[in-house]
Amino acid sequence: MAAPARDPPGYRYAAAILPTGSILSTIEVASHRRLFDFFAAVRSDENSLYDVEFDALLGSYCNTLSLVRFLELGLSVACVCTKFPELAYMNEGRVQFEVHQPLIARDGPHPVEQPVHNYMTKVIDRRALNAAFSLATEAIALLTGEALDGTGISLHRQLRAIQQLARNVQAVLGAFERGTADQMLHVLLEKAPPLALLLPMQRYLDNGRLATRVARATLVAELKRSFCDTSFFLGKAGHRREAIEAWLVDLTTATQPSVAVPRLTHADTRGRPVDGVLVTTAAIKQRLLQSFLKVEDTEADVPVTYGEMVLNGANLVTALVMGKAVRSLDDVGRHLLDMQEEQLEANRETLDELESAPQTTRVRADLVAIGDRLVFLEALERRIYAATNVPYPLVGAMDLTFVLPLGLFNPAMERFAAHAGDLVPAPGHPEPRAFPPRQLFFWGKDHQVLRLSMENAVGTVCHPSLMNIDAAVGGVNHDPVEAANPYGAYVAAPAGPGADMQQRFLNAWRQRLAHGRVRWVAECQMTAEQFMQPDNANLALELHPAFDFFAGVADVELPGGEVPPAGPGAIQATWRVVNGNLPLALCPVAFRDARGLELGVGRHAMAPATIAAVRGAFEDRSYPAVFYLLQAAIHGNEHVFCALARLVTQCITSYWNNTRCAAFVNDYSLVSYIVTYLGGDLPEECMAVYRDLVAHVEALAQLVDDFTLPGPELGGQAQAELNHLMRDPALLPPLVWDCDGLMRHAALDRHRDCRIDAGGHEPVYAAACNVATADFNRNDGRLLHNTQARAADAADDRPHRPADWTVHHKIYYYVLVPAFSRGRCCTAGVRFDRVYATLQNMVVPEIAPGEECPSDPVTDPAHPLHPANLVANTVKRMFHNGRVVVDGPAMLTLQVLAHNMAERTTALLCSAAPDAGANTASTANMRIFDGALHAGVLLMAPQHLDHTIQNGEYFYVLPVHALFAGADHVANAPNFPPALRDLARDVPLVPPALGANYFSSIRQPVVQHARESAAGENALTYALMAGYFKMSPVALYHQLKTGLHPGFGFTVVRQDRFVTENVLFSERASEAYFLGQLQVARHETGGGVNFTLTQPRGNVDLGVGYTAVAATGTVRNPVTDMGNLPQNFYLGRGAPPLLDNAAAVYLRNAVVAGNRLGPAQPLPVFGCAQVPRRAGMDHGQDAVCEFIATPVATDINYFRRPCNPRGRAAGGVYAGDKEGDVIALMYDHGQSDPARPFAATANPWASQRFSYGDLLYNGAYHLNGASPVLSPCFKFFTAADITAKHRCLERLIVETGSAVSTATAASDVQFKRPPGCRELVEDPCGLFQEAYPITCASDPALLRSARDGEAHARETHFTQYLIYDASPLKGLSL
């Protein structure tokens, strides 16, 4: 039934109020009132009629209002808007451009150029806007009148329903208004390349192409520089007006003008056309207006009429012709088809309408002058996006990766200070800045000074992944190798008598040794620069800080035969055991000495007199040979020593008086006995030398405890034994007189699989040997074990002395002896039959009862050493030749030797598996082989020129280790091959039956360090002692926690996210915007009706180049805390654990207990552990720091500029055009690093395939939870990601170049933002494969000098270094 007649007819009562103001306000107000009048006046109970009317009116209203609001925005400057009702029916739309190439008329012999016309087509990009609202069933009933009952309440409810509908419709219309602006802003952003990309492309393109690799390399270098310079420029420039104006000029002149010159355009109030629009955030706009830009006008005239699309027949015609808006096909014909005048007369009305004055209105605008251009400055953040859940497109995010060098060591020319009074320590204290740095200071968010120390790396290196090398061994053996010279990589089983071992070795290996220096010797003589050269063929085998990779004999179980069998080779790996075995090129001598100097501060130091006395003995080429015979005769036996105490005292005193040197310092047993028993018999100065030696040994032993944390026994061994090699019973002293060490070696846990080979036999311990039972030609496993006075019923199969006795012996021989001898001494076997024969071959003149013992061998004929009593080849003659004065009673004590004798020198080969702290599935089958001599002696300075004693008469050279293989001793031994004499000076000739370099606990780098060190004996002993700390997860935990430098540094990688404020500039009329007919869809539901509104849109770029450009203006705020949170691998899936469960549990609990990333409890059964949620957060999301093991010799200058954390360039920045160039660039170290052509890499432990860093962070191995989400290093190590980024950068350069070049109609060209721009803006470090250094220093004083802006602040101070910021954030205050 019809509504009551009291309602006013039509729309009179609302429309009668005439609107005032501009045309835009008139349209808006009229639209609102007309819609309200319709709902207030129409009453009907026919739903279909209401639906039809409602749909039609709603569509008209939305079109009008959305266009009106859009024109008020600065975005409309960049658009040519055209109504196109039939857009929804269009299959494909194209726009054609005719581009005229400019010519220059020239004189001279140049060919005459003809005009060139290029044609370009572009395809319309289809889009749509959608919105929806719903009407409840009851509201529909009220609107149609079905629910009216004639009461006033029902009429009030109807009015409320009408008002609510109007509010819903207004909200939808508001969505369309904002959606139009948002859609156009996204359209402009999609075609706007970054300024950092566009500027270099325009400068370096040659006819739109990069003709050569050189041009591309130049372009990429400029691209990286441009990105750092132009990013965040408004924030970095501060108040420098000229710099910001120049940056804005670059921004507004980098684009190409539109080919469209529309008749209707924006202009200021004086009629000057607006050249473009600059869209940014409210904060940047306000700053530009306040400080840098001059407002030319506050109002603008904008058009309010648009072109329209019409259909005539089956053809769809563009609305843009010669840059003007058209209304019909007649205008198209006039401009395109050149129709006759009579044809145009029929459309005169249309043409008159076209030529009429444009309809414009005046709106509020900020028009500014940038250079010679008039620009509409716009900020839509508050006007469009406020109170919506849609982020502002010009507020983005950027991820930047930073790199920090931790624990590196300055090269020699960088270890200096400006003058002595600069940054001096407190009086009386050592200079800590001369020690190797172990920490790093930098600024975090809010200018916090943060610290990173090596302790923070425990979550990375104190993890079983350190020992997981199965993938590396399998990878490097992919191609066959040849074991050309296996010396040093092959261990033979001892066989036969020890006296012939050296000669048999030389005879069997002569041909192999004659090939020249072996790898492990040559590497020790390289500098860091030489080692990193691409021509170093063995660089490919330096993959891991804790393992040696080498070419050995394949499929041979060690120990093997006397010589390796012929056959193929294989790349093998052995645990390096201690950090002293790191190559000298990567851990140089200067670093080791500096570390030793640091450890010696505040600890025991030998007196200069002690050093002079001991050094003099080791360098004395006239050292009395009879002392060696006495040493062998005593054979470490405490009872024999006490029996010969008078003779020993006189020998020591006589030698001291002659030379001021200390005798018997080549045998620690004798040194210890002398301190214990001869305190009152020797001169005080002489006795002080021996006491000082023992005290120093004890101090070095205490050093281990200083750097070991308390903890439970693991694998049956104390923590100190797992931490330091000298405390590990698996290593024997090179010279042993008793069998205590052998018994403790055999008593180790069964998992260490300890074995001892005594001359090819199992050891058998014997307690007594005298002249009646001695067998000097014995060839079995019998070993004498009676060096201490003991009970008669004491067992022979257990140690007699505490473990410290063996430990002190090892420290003395492996630390003090190399520090004094510098590798010139040599171990030797003893011919005991000749020794005893000589010592017993003497006649002592009888002294009558009551007479005093003769004291002067020169004047007293009764003295046994009087010339009249000397006989050739007797012990008396040897005393005389050595100028040693002893009396008759002392010589008579030699008779006791017949009751306690040694039989022979036995070569021992001991083997053991890694300890519980290093035993994993990868290392379980590895064996370490070390040699030792039972009943051998240590020869000090060579005496081969002394012909009073036949060389080899009493001792035969038998080097047990490279530290004790002096070249002069070895090369001058009887029957030494002359062809090997020169080789012996470089290569330590140790028989394979006593070990091999790659299988020894102590290897050639330690030997070379002792030879080359310029440090004094005190510092060198501490340096050597520091080099014997182990490299295992458990050992490194102790060292890092207690502040010991582990011998290698770290590259710290951290990724931070920053919220950025961006700037967009677009040329005038650079985008055609097509608006289709609004469509309303109705969907019935149980509770009402849903209305979905859809309007098709389309757009096409109107330029023959880039007409828009974007730039990152400043940082709004960092999202992350820019902090020092260390990574914890125990949160990931992890490598195979330690085989000893107790050790695995202890290590995990110890690392997690002190780590801020410790897993939350309880631990999940499956998947990764979760990070505990803390109660609060202040500076932002935690940024995780990851650690890449790096040699301390890595050039610190590598980190002063953007660099790849792997140590070698990667990705499309440097790669060539060939297939596989990207992979070759990453892993082929036979080629130089393109970023540093003078080297192949800065870190071979991370840049090579299957290296330690590669195994940790390369996602291809699926280890330790390495993922782009959890790991900032992932993108630098994963080849698939790097290849993808390479292709991305290639495409970015190619497509940007083709866009700037002349295009033809052969293909549809859209000048869109090239693929890869998003990566360039959001993750430039991944795209460039470079991380940026930030301001950091190993010394806080250097950091403060950089903060205070000190002019020419130095970058180094002794071993400390300062790195300046070289990132895009340089100059920003965060």
Curated annotation (Swiss-Prot):
GO MF annotation terms: structural molecule activity
Keyword set, alphabetical order: Capsid protein, Host nucleus, T=16 icosahedral capsid protein, Virion
Pfam name, any one: Herpes_MCP
Gene Ontology CC annotation, any one: T=16 icosahedral viral capsid
Listed InterPro entries: Herpes_MCP (IPR000912), Herpes_MCP_upper_sf (IPR023233)
Function statement: Self-assembles to form an icosahedral capsid with a T=16 symmetry, about 200 nm in diameter, and consisting of 150 hexons and 12 pentons (total of 162 capsomers). Hexons form the edges and faces of the capsid and are each composed of six MCP molecules. In contrast, one penton is found at each of the 12 vertices. Eleven of the pentons are MCP pentamers, while the last vertex is occupied by the portal complex.
Family designation: Belongs to the herpesviridae major capsid protein family.
Name of this protein: Major capsid protein
Originating organism: Human herpesvirus 2 (strain HG52)
Gene of this entry: MCP
